[in-house]
Amino acid sequence: MATTKPYRVLLYYMYTTIENPEEFAAEHLEFCNSLELKGRILVAKEGINGTCSGTVEQTEKYMEAMNNDPRFDGIVFKIDEADGHAFKKMHVRPRPELVTLRLEDDINPHEITGKYLEPKDFYEAMKQEDTVIIDARNDYEFDLGHFKGAIKPDIESFRELPDWIRENKEVLEGKKILTYCTGGIRCEKFSGWLVREGYEDVSQLHGGIVTYGKDPEVQGELWDGQCYVFDERIAVPVNQKEHVIVGKDHFTGEPCERYVNCSNPECNKKILCSEENEAKYLRACSHECRVSPRNRYVIQHELTEEQVAAALEQIEAGK
């Protein structure tokens, strides 16, 4: 690929057997640090799930090493160009699961998973009338961007998805089911779970939203908004043909694509809000969070009690 920016962000996963995740994680962290990469990599007995950033040279060395390891034969790297690192630190952590579903009887994607659809086939399938599109991500990811007509499960974490499906099965019965997520890893298990639950026509977007947005044929069409990513960038564009903002400011409902975390560390909820409203509402999602003694916005900006009281009074006056 033609390189125009000095850094890259890699996104990848692979379901493969890693005998000793703890030992592998420690060695892999050392290796990543030697390359001066930064990122977040999860390792489990069932495989690896990672995203990391570095210079073109550093990421090339990393991909070469991974490709030379027989355990990762065939691994696919999704590559974004960047002006700098997308992470502050490098973490490699062992986990019981790569994606947290916590099923009593786990899904092995090598044994059972939904049909893979390439971007063009997924695009065509979305336009069919008897199709249901399920977003397999969390609610705050959906709120920033999603496929047109996709169903938003009312969940805050991936492990809540099976229960939501069981409670809303009438929406899916007799339909062709399409499911998608950021890079594809969640759908490997989720689509397999749907098949095991008895749904007969289940397909997943191969490579996820990130691959769909880069596809030269579909060019991200039928996607509205941006794609939430778990690094310093927060959001990346998908639709190359038109940019429709679907995110709404938490306080005013105006179009917004800027995420912040609630300033109350005990809440930490992700909210969409403008810089202006961040200052006006002390970056807090509610009155309770605004008056929290641990409000990070108040502490960071060294606001006095009088200044906080004035801000609260202004909010009250504006209601």
Curated annotation (Swiss-Prot):
Transmembrane region(s): none
Annotated GO MF terms: oxidoreductase activity, acting on paired donors, with incorporation or reduction of molecular oxygen
Main EC class the enzyme belongs to: oxidoreductase
Reactions performed catalytically: uridine(34) in tRNA + AH2 + O2 = 5-hydroxyuridine(34) in tRNA + A + H2O
EC number: 1.14.-.-
Oxidoreductase is among the record's keywords: yes
PROSITE patterns on file: RHODANESE_3 (PS50206)
Domain Rhodanese, chain residue ranges per copy: 127-221
Active site residues per record: C181 (cysteine persulfide intermediate)
InterPro entries in the cross-refs: Rhodanese-like_dom (IPR001763), Rhodanese-like_dom_sf (IPR036873), Rhodanese_C (IPR022111), TrhO (IPR020936), TRHO_N (IPR040503)
Keywords assigned by UniProt, alphabetized: Oxidoreductase, tRNA processing
Stored Pfam families: Rhodanese, Rhodanese_C, UPF0176_N
Database matches in PANTHER family: RHODANESE-LIKE DOMAIN-CONTAINING PROTEIN 7-RELATED, THIOSULFATE SULFURTRANSFERASE/RHODANESE-LIKE DOMAIN-CONTAINING PROTEIN 2
Function: Catalyzes oxygen-dependent 5-hydroxyuridine (ho5U) modification at position 34 in tRNAs.
Official protein name in the record: tRNA uridine(34) hydroxylase
Organism name: Bacillus cereus (strain ATCC 14579 / DSM 31 / CCUG 7414 / JCM 2152 / NBRC 15305 / NCIMB 9373 / NCTC 2599 / NRRL B-3711)
